[in-house]
Amino acid sequence: MKNTMKRMFCSMTVLVTAPYNEEGRKELENLFGSVAYQSWKEQGRAYREDELIQLLKATNATGLITELDQVTDSVFASVPELSFVGVCRGMPSNVDVAAASKRGIPVFYTPGRNAQAVAEMFIGNVISFLRHTSASNQWLKDGEWDSDYLQAYVKFKGNELTGKTVGMIGFGAVGQRIAKLLTAFDCKIKYYDPYIQDDHPLYEKASLKTVFSDSDIVSVHLPRTEETLGLIDRQYFDLMKESAIFVNTSRAVVVNREDLLFVLKEHKISGAILDVFYHEPPEESDYELISLPNVLATPHLAGATFEVEDHHVTILNKALKKWKGEKTLNIQTMYNKDALKTGG
């Protein structure tokens, strides 16, 4: 880590391949010296490993800010001058963190950057599902309204969100932001999260089974880990109310696909709102879910707002200022701080 800290105080170039607004880039210039901006958006895809190495070498970069590129052990080995990596994602899943830690390189990330975006889309999609907005919109466009006004009034009469019990599986930044927005609807919030030790003053901590059995809406907010793969299966779906809705905006693989397909086809629950799939773009097996009439599906859009890019700039620049200014590893958004403290 000493070499990393020493390099940090010299004027350096930061290669930025993530979308980064002009104000954020100016802050980086003031902080480090210069910025080489090569956003992946310019070519419409992430840089390949060889392209990333070439870019880092061509720009003499000693810092990297990325969003999509795979930052592998080979990248670190090829560019030993790297002093930090910033990742504009909720988890630095595209970076070989162990390889970075071994070399004393801190990896920063931006948890919660899309919390507001996902929370707003959750509210919108749930209301759309409850009020049959998508179906009624298509029905109207298809010219089906051929009787009096009561035809649609009766056919698409739905339910209100207000007063519903909403269960959260995982209660991190996104889950808590959703809960905050739901207070405007007088919803009761129950959450399951084994990593939150203390009870929340406003919301009810509950077991996984209780969240599924008591909720009108169950929403999943879990990362992909060995622990969560296939966690949500038939034993939990069978606990849900027949009128309940299942929502997944996190990762498809935390849910057993066949079990979800069964309960939807058999109308064991009211339906599902899905923004993530087992293959993206979807394959035939995914379309079996997507095409069901009681599924509201969107193409992984929950975090897709322009403001999310502003949020990750704010979060990352704040961390980098603290790291450089205070010469500290005690930064909440430094993902591998514990490994660096113990020597990798």
From Swiss-Prot:
Top-level taxon in the UniProt lineage: Bacteria
Active-site residues from the entry: R251, E280, H300
GO biological process, alphabetically ordered: L-serine biosynthetic process
Enzyme class: oxidoreductase
Tagged with keyword Oxidoreductase: yes
Documented EC number(s): 1.1.1.-
Transmembrane domains' residue ranges: none
Record flagged with keyword Kinase: no
GO MF, one annotated term: NAD binding
Keywords: NAD, Oxidoreductase
Residues that hold NAD(+) according to the record: D193, D275
Induction cue: Induced by sulfate, part of the yoaDCB operon.
Protein family membership: Belongs to the D-isomer specific 2-hydroxyacid dehydrogenase family.
Name of protein: Putative 2-hydroxyacid dehydrogenase YoaD
